């Protein structure tokens, strides 16, 4: 593992040519102003000073990383990341199940997708803020802040006695959850070379190997039908305990780094906060975080997507002004967001100079489709297995997490293979193709006891495909930019990932709520019975066991709706494969990030892409010359 730190970042600290950032940080050399590039106002000296503070944090991060250049210290770091991943991974594995029981206890099970949409919108808005703040204040402080939000949200959810309060807790919980995952991912990226980056990023996912088998036992013994409140609440102290090792690890890194001469050399450089104080930094952070843009994006997404999940059910309510108003407002906010980002934002959510390159926009497209397709196929898969396949709680929990298990088992072998191949694009394309195969299998096996083996097979294929492209997409785009912009492109990918989950949950929920009740009523013919089956399916199946006419009617209704869900997922696998073809294919090296990028460029465009070259030459092979 010595190759991870074959380059001493401290020796390179005078060579910070971060994607032409010296043109932005130095007003004298910044000839082409933002007015020319974006149609934005000229950046102020104070704002540039805050941007320069980000480079100071990056330099400090590199010195901290060099303090852990021994293999055993790297092993301690990875073990700490594993323990942290175990905490949020196990909680994530079972909390979505408890959410289903919570909504069912409120007789609002169909609002599961509404909560998922709210979660995803909050998550998407949080990603950008976390990434930009981490470059100003450092990774550790943001990580601790995320843990606090996680705990607060967990406590609120555990004490909620209606779906509105549960959703409010979900806002805090998800803001913390995505922050922990993103900052942990950035920390591991800071301390690994591109060649070993995938292995490091896989480490927090490895607990799924254990969690897949114990999650079912936990949920069945916890009796979530009765005790879901305590089952959620106990994570308010379990998860922070799992974060203690990584926090201690980061503190130890800083302690070692502070004793180095390189760190003392940086002491002469004051941060923006040290020079200007709290009030002025708040004013400048308002522009750096693009607070207005983030709020407009979150409000627009929420106003459009949440009504889609609320308008159906026992009674269609599209004629209700309380739904129509927010829905229309969401679309009205889109042009307002565009005008703000183009004319007024100093640091736009989507920085054009980054996003315009295919390395970035194609990876963002894939990130969006990953979660969109996932939620279309799996949003109600657990419920389908319980109600329409007659799985037990333990079995359904294990099967629902099977794709994660397979993906995790394959990940270390694949990551080691990548260190030898040093190319990711062929694997990404093959992984996207496997997802299409998995969606086809889920379409075929969607109800009846005979679907048990088919669903397991589909999720295994899904898991292998997940290994080959979900995390590699992030590493692919990181390998095309400098260290200065690594957190930004990582956050952009994860923001689109969360937006994909929001849209996927909304579309999935819209199909479910608009269709399911009508199908149940059509097959049962009894309004009271159909209403009970729709609103509280877990309670209904305890009364009407497998094989009864009422249960068969409910099973067929679930099969019909799940068919629509998987068709949408299958169709969107086509653009997923198309985006994978558009990726760049940079060679993975022993450096933390791309070190030299031409002035004025934000992405390394001098990569060799054999796959795209082959496709470009393909038409010439079928041309015929006239004799």
UniProtKB/Swiss-Prot annotation:
One of its GO terms (cellular component) is endosome membrane. It is found in: Cell membrane; Endosome membrane. Residues 92-110, 157-167, 219-231, 312-323, 389-398, 446-454, 585-627 are cytoplasmic. It comes from the Eukaryota. InterPro entries: MFS_trans_sf (IPR036259). Residues 1-70, 132-135, 189-197, 253-290, 345-367, 420-424, 476-563 are extracellular. The chain crosses the membrane at residues 71-91, 111-131, 136-156, 168-188, 198-218, 232-252, 291-311, 324-344, 368-388, 399-419, 425-445, 455-475, 564-584. One of its GO terms (molecular function) is siderophore-iron transmembrane transporter activity. Keywords: Cell membrane, Endosome, Ion transport, Iron, Iron transport, Membrane, Transmembrane, Transmembrane helix, Transport. GO terms for biological process: intracellular iron ion homeostasis; siderophore transport; transmembrane transport. Belongs to the major facilitator superfamily. Involved in the transport of siderophore ferrichrome and so has a role in iron homeostasis. This is Siderophore iron transporter ARN1. It comes from Saccharomyces cerevisiae (strain ATCC 204508 / S288c).
């Amino acid at each position: 593992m010595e190759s991870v730190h074959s380059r001493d970042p401290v020796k390179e600290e005078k060579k910070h040519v971060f994607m032409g950032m010296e043109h932005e940080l130095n007003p004298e050399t910044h000839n082409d102003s933002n007015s020319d590039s974006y149609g934005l106002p000229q950046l102020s000296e104070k704002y540039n000073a805050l941007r320069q503070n980000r480079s100071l944090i990056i330099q400090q991060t590199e010195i901290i990383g060099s303090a852990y250049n021994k293999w055993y210290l790297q092993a301690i770091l990875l073990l700490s990341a594993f323990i942290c991943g175990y905490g949020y991974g196990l909680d994530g594995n079972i909390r979505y199940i408890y959410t289903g029981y919570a909504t069912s206890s409120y007789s609002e099970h169909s609002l599961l997708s509404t909560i998922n949409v709210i979660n995803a919108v909050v998550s998407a808005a949080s990603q950008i803020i976390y990434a930009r703040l981490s470059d100003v204040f450092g990774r550790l402080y943001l990580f601790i802040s995320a843990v606090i939000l996680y705990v607060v949200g967990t406590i609120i959810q555990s004490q909620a006695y209606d779906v509105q309060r549960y959703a409010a807790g979900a806002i805090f919980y998800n803001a913390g959850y995505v922050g922990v995952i993103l900052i942990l991912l950035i920390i591991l990226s800071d301390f690994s070379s591109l060649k070993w980056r995938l292995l490091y990023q896989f480490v927090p996912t490895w607990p799924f190997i254990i969690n897949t088998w114990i999650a079912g036992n936990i949920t069945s013994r916890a009796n979530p039908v009765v005790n879901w409140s305590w089952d959620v609440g106990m994570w308010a102290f379990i998860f922070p305990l799992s974060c203690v090792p990584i926090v201690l690890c980061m503190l130890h890194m800083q302690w070692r780094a502070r004793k180095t001469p390189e760190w003392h050399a940086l002491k002469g450089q004051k941060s923006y906060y040290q020079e200007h104080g709290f009030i002025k930094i708040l004013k400048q952070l308002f522009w750096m975080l693009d607070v207005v843009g983030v709020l407009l994006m979150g409000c627009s997404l929420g106003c459009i997507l949440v009504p889609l999940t609320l308008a159906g059910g026992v009674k269609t309510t599209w004629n209700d002004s309380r739904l129509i108003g927010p829905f229309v407002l969401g679309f009205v906010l889109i042009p307002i967001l565009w005008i703000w980002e183009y004319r007024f934002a100093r640091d736009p959510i989507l920085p054009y100079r980054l996003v315009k390159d295919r390395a970035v926009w194609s990876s963002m497209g894939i990130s969006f489709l990953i979660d969109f397709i996932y939620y279309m196929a799996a949003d109600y898969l657990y419920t389908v297995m319980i109600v329409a396949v007659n799985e037990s709680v333990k079995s359904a929990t294990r099967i629902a997490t099977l794709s994660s298990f397979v993906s995790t088992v394959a990940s270390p072998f694949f990551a080691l293979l990548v260190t030898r191949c040093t190319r990711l694009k062929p694997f990404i394309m093959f992984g996207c193709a496997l997802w299409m195969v998995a969606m086809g299998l889920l379409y075929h096996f969607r109800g009846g006891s005979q679907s048990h083996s088919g669903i397991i097979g589909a999720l295994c294929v899904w898991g292998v495909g997940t290994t080959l492209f979900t995390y590699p997409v992030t590493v692919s785009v990181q390998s095309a930019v400098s260290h200065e912009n690594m957190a930004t492109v990582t956050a952009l990918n994860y923001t689109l990932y969360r937006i994909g989950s929001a849209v996927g949950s909304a579309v999935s929920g819209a199909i479910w709520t608009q269709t399911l009740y009508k199908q149940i009523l059509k097959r049962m013919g009894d309004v009271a019975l159909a209403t009970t089956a729709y609103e509280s399916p877990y309670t209904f199946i305890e009364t009407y066991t497998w094989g009864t006419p009422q249960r068969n009617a409910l099973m067929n209704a679930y099969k019909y709706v799940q068919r629509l869900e998987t068709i949408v997922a299958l169709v969107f696998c086509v653009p997923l494969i198309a985006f994978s073809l558009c990726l760049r294919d940079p060679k993975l090296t022993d450096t933390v990030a791309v070190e030299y990028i031409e002035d004025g460029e934000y992405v390394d465009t001098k990569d060799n892409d054999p796959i795209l070259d082959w496709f470009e030459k393909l038409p010439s092979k079928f041309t015929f010359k006239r004799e």
